């Protein structure tokens, strides 16, 4: 006979990490960082038809200090990359990044010197969302996948080392193809 059978009804056993993960995943405040056409689909997700508020995202934060999720929606130019990194550094811990669309994930069809070939060269990305532009349903699905990832995130020192390792691996990763001018 285990401990669960001896407890009266209405008592739940859990760890602090699981409770914190549950609370954290249901109270995300995304930062508005729409850069191109994917931002239109991100705005549609906040509308009444798709209602992102049912997942705890009541409002999009205009300041990075009050946001913990950055949705990079669209292509990132070389001039915008330092601004993106500065906004990421100003966000409160814990923070997550969602790359929305092919342009944010890999540069998309814009294979030239002015566009960053994937936002993961600037900030560590937690979820990649494909599509050009991805539909609001896909953004909601990616947010649910991010909720699962947040639920499993450790706390304290374990969390800091996990984040540092993930960021270092993401920023030091080599591109999958070698770029030679505008032609491959």
Swiss-Prot record:
Keywords: 4Fe-4S, Cell membrane, Iron, Iron-sulfur, Membrane, Metal-binding, NAD, Quinone, Translocase, Transport. GO terms for cellular component: plasma membrane; respiratory chain complex I. Its EC number is 7.1.1.-. It is found in: Cell membrane. SUPFAM superfamilies: HydA/Nqo6-like. Disulfide bonds: none annotated. The keyword Cell division does not apply. It comes from the Bacteria. Its cofactor is [4Fe-4S] cluster. GO terms for biological process: aerobic respiration; electron transport coupled proton transport. [4Fe-4S] cluster binds at residues 37-38, 103, 132. It is an enzyme of class 7 (translocase). Gene3D superfamilies: 3.40.50.12280. One of its GO terms (molecular function) is 4 iron, 4 sulfur cluster binding. It is a peripheral membrane protein. Binds 1 [4Fe-4S] cluster. InterPro entries: NADH_UbQ_OxRdtase-like_20kDa, NADH_UQ_OxRdtase_20Kd_su. NDH-1 is composed of 14 different subunits. Subunits NuoB, C, D, E, F, and G constitute the peripheral sector of the complex. NDH-1 shuttles electrons from NADH, via FMN and iron-sulfur (Fe-S) centers, to quinones in the respiratory chain. The immediate electron acceptor for the enzyme in this species is believed to be a menaquinone. Couples the redox reaction to proton translocation (for every two electrons transferred, four hydrogen ions are translocated across the cytoplasmic membrane), and thus conserves the redox energy in a proton gradient. Belongs to the complex I 20 kDa subunit family. This is NADH-quinone oxidoreductase subunit B. The gene is nuoB.
């Amino acid at each position: 006979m285990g401990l669960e059978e001896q407890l009266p009804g209405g008592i739940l056993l859990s760890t602090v990490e699981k409770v914190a993960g549950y609370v954290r995943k249901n109270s995300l405040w995304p930062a508005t960082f729409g850069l191109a056409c994917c931002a239109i689909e991100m705005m549609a997700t906040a509308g009444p038809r798709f209602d992102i508020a049912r997942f705890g995202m009541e409002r999009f934060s205009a300041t990075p200090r009050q946001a913990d999720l950055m949705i990079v929606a669209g292509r990132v130019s070389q001039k915008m990359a330092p601004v993106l990194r500065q906004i990421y550094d100003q966000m409160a811990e814990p923070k997550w990044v969602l790359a929305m669309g092919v342009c944010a994930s890999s540069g998309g069809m814009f294979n030239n010197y002015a566009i960053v070939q994937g936002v993961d060269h600037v900030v560590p990305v937690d979820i990649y969302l494909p599509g050009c532009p991805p539909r609001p349903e896909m953004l909601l699905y990616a947010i649910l996948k991010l909720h699962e990832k947040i639920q499993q995130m450790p706390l304290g020192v374990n969390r800091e080392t996990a984040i540092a390792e993930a960021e270092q691996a993401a920023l030091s990763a080599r591109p999958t193809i070698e770029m030679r001018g505008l032609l491959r």
